[in-house]
From Swiss-Prot:
Monomer. SUPFAM superfamilies: HemD-like. The gene is Uros. Belongs to the uroporphyrinogen-III synthase family. It comes from Mus musculus (Mouse). Pfam families: HEM4. One of its GO terms (biological process) is protoporphyrinogen IX biosynthetic process. Its EC number is 4.2.1.75. PANTHER family: UROPORPHYRINOGEN III SYNTHASE, UROPORPHYRINOGEN-III SYNTHASE. This is Uroporphyrinogen-III synthase. It comes from the Eukaryota. One of its GO terms (molecular function) is folic acid binding. Keywords: Cytoplasm, Heme biosynthesis, Lyase, Porphyrin biosynthesis. One of its GO terms (cellular component) is cytosol.
């Protein structure tokens, strides 16, 4: 049974994307198609803020791209030595909040201690942050231009100061249309399609509708999280399942429950 995941590939130690591995255990043949590209912005401003941890109460990361922006700042501005010598430890003396295991892993790789990774989405992370003692200093929140309002609003309502800054913007992947066309020609109609973000849905849906034709209604549509579910509902797309958390295991469990493949894990 063939399933389509609209995301880019991330290799683990085995050289395979963990989502493909997990779905294979369930007897599902998964294909990944990237639908998003990212352009970084405001890096000099971010670099300046990273140099002054004393001005902030901590950090918030809700996407891997925001962590990549920090890594780029360290590399481009020759700050790696200063980061290793003192900046990293000064940030670690504060709270570094993250959503999801993928983001937490990248945060750990730049030497920071992540907390809140098990939250799974921005709303749950906001609840976690609100449950902790807060500083009078703002939390620094590097994010994309298309960020949800849930986390900032919840923190504001609780009187927790936060300074968000746009460090990347999301654009359509240049190969979306061609990759989807090739997939449909080679593999046919997938049993399910998983959307990993509202932006991914926005940039790919019209191509999927055109390529699927009269078979569109046969496809089971899956969301990686609540914000994607809301975006799908706004488009009138039936949501067969929302993963309980943005992890390979949770997504595989959701797809397995919807499709009930043979030889399932």
């Amino acid at each position: 049974m063939k399933v389509l995941l609209l995301k880019d590939a991330k290799e683990d130690d085995s050289g395979l994307d963990p989502y493909i591995q997990e779905l294979r255990l369930c007897g599902l043949e998964a294909t990944l198609i990237p639908v998003l590209s990212f352009e970084f912005m405001s890096l000099p401003s971010l670099s300046e803020k990273l140099s002054h941890p004393e001005g902030f109460g901590g950090l918030i990361f809700t996407s891997p791209r925001a962590v990549e922006a920090v890594k780029l700042c360290l590399e481009k501005d020759n700050k790696t030595e200063a980061w290793e010598k003192s900046l990293k430890d000064r940030w670690n003396a504060k709270s570094v909040y993250v959503v999801g295991s993928a983001t937490a892993s990248l945060v750990n790789k730049i030497g920071l201690d992540a907390e809140g990774a098990g939250s799974g989405n921005a709303e749950k992370l906001a609840e976690y942050i609100c449950s902790k003692p807060s500083s009078e200093l703002p939390l620094l929140f590097p994010c994309g231009t298309i960020k949800g309002d849930t986390l900032p609003k919840m923190l504001k309502d609780k009187g927790i100061p936060m300074e968000s800054m746009h460090v990347y913007q999301t654009v359509p992947h240049p190969g979306i249309q061609g990759s989807l066309k090739s997939y449909y020609e080679d593999q046919g109609i997938p049993a399910s399609i998983t959307f990993f973000s509202p932006s991914g849905l926005k940039y790919s849906l019209e191509y999927i509708q055109a390529l699927s034709g009269s078979s569109f209604d046969q496809i089971k549509f899956i969301a990686i999280g609540p914000s994607t579910t809301r975006a799908m509902a706004a488009k009138g797309l039936p949501v067969s399942c929302t993963a309980e958390s943005p992890t390979p295991q949770a997504l595989a469990a959701g797809i397995r429950n919807v499709l009930k493949p043979n030889h399932c894990c």
